[in-house]
Amino acid sequence: MNFLPLLGSATLIKGTPRVGHGVIRMDQGNAIKKDVQEFYDNLGWDKSDAGFSDASIYEDLRPVAADYIHRCHQRVKQHLPDSGRYLLDVASGPVQYDEYIAYSAGHERRVCADISLRALVEARKRLGDKGLYVVADVANLPFADDTFDGVVSLHTIYHVPAAEQEKAFNEIHRVLAPERSAVVVYSWGARSPLMLLALMPFLTWSWLSRRLRARADSLGRSDSPTLYGHHYGHGWFAGRKWPFAYNLYTWRSVSPDFTKIYANPRLFGRSLLSVLFRMENAWPRFFGRFGQYPMIVVRKNPPA
């Protein structure tokens, strides 16, 4: 199987790329990037009847939440170009949800870039020849400026080393074609005011659990890999001097922990999430600012 990016397309890959084909620059955040790579190669993209391990660990896969999550996934496509030559999927994983496939329906090719080779093998099974597959570091994308008609990055940048997250946003903007848009789904993590308010008692227990797991790790008793994440808050993002224009909307205002606790299938769980979805649509900027998962729509201005 060939994973070299876009063979025969000299305009897409830089003549002297900063990242070679299939090579990850590990000069910054070396251990973190290696840990993320190993997590997904060894565990995250294990597959079972329930789906991939990544979703089983980090998502609420219960039927009561399915319609809400499905409609949240569909929000991304509203802000992507309907058509074009290349759509870049940054940290594509295996393109695990059907809604994800729809994002590139009107594009000739979907370029999947991921730090995990195993992710790209699985993505190839999903997309076939529609896809082009590149092992790459999101903070050092090996593509020419102004290349892609659209870019999507879902739950990626908060797994990038904290010191490189600003660069990762800038890399997405750099490779985006002028007058086009990119969609980045981020997470404020524990800095989401709404989730702090709703989950405070449970967050205390979670903090204690993490301390116990960290102690077990230090004693060499950890029996499973963990995934790095660093979540900046809205203040950090709003305080950067970005070279791009952007709008901030909600992708989803609540975390899987929230839905698992409050969306009880026997106590109007579906109705609760349906009302929440309508509220998010009515006030997308409010919930993007204060909820769990902002959807950051980056736009690239035409050349001056």
List the predicted regions and their residue ranges.
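Conserved class I S-adenosyl-L-methionine
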Residues: 20-81, 96, 100, 183-210
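A C-terminal cap/extension of S-adenosyl-L-methionine-dependent methyltransferases
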Residues: 235, 246-304
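A short glycine-rich, Lys/Arg-flanked "PGG" loop and its adjoining helix->strand segment in the class I
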Residues: 166-178
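A conserved beta-strand element that flanks and buttresses the S-adenosyl-L-methionine
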Residues: 152
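Short alpha-helix
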Residues: 223-244
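Class I SAM-dependent methyltransferase SAM/SAH-binding core
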Residues: 88, 93-140
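Short catalytic micro-motifs in class I SAM-dependent methyltransferases
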Residues: 155-156
